[in-house]
Amino acid sequence: MQLNPHRAGRVWMLGGLILFLAGLGRAADVRVVGSDLLGLEFSQALYACAVREGIPLAVALDGSRPGYDQLASGRADLGLLTLPAGENPDPAGFTAVPLAWHRVVVIVAAATPLDRVTLADLAAVFGTDVPVSYNRWGDLGLRGEWEGRPVTALAAAQGAGLSEQIFRHLILQDRPLKSPLGRYTSAADLAFRLEGDGRVLALAAALPPQVAGLKLLPVAVRAEDPAFSPTPENLQSGDYPLRLALRVVFRRTAALRVLPVVRFILSEEVARVLERAELVPAPRSVRRQHALALEKP
């Protein structure tokens, strides 16, 4: 019997954890919880770090909200949480460090003569129950042969990542996307649709890799504001608005025990893992600054 990849990953992690704890002969010293979108590679990297450091480690990446509950109740020491700004643990009892960013990018064909969009534009293209609805490129300011062309709006298949949830929360106040709406099932499917239809305007977590002829549109909060691209620096500063932080959160009382793990999580090795999971790590200088600050007594 063959396991599917997700189940095989869970079995691998559980087996590795049992062997690691049994070899050390004691219960886990550091209990890590949080986002279920980080992937098997991230968990493997954490266990490899724990072996190097000699730290008994238990990892349960079952979701940010369950992780929050476990941190708040004292059943976990360290969390990797993606939560709206007002829902992070009390700073009096926890330290929170931004590690990376989930982002929503806006993609069009490179030949599309549009060089920026605003949040209101995106709401009008993708939203329901909004003051105005956009269906043609002329609504976005294009003229000439583009003015009457329909916009083909695309979003990821429901349940695929966080891009739709982030967009709905930040732009539509949690209202649903309009229906009917085109949906893509993978990065390859998105690339195929963008290459085959120059009228597409798509929301995604990242630009499909190794695909020419596409571009990311800078986003402005309002029409009179400058537009920003989704670079690490613009995500960190908040200039690019379509983003949600992945934070490392740990109990202050557990700071000494979790420090080696936190130091590793802020490393370049983990940054590369996060990139492969379609997150944008905080700039290296920012992560290094946080790591140095945590070393101080």
Q: Which ranges hold each PLM region?
A:
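Bacterial N-terminal signal peptides that target proteins for export
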Residues: 2-13
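Bacterial N-terminal signal peptides
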Residues: 12-22
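Flexible loop/hinge segments at secondary-structure junctions
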Residues: 28-297
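Sec/Tat signal peptide C-region and signal peptidase I cleavage site
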Residues: 23-27
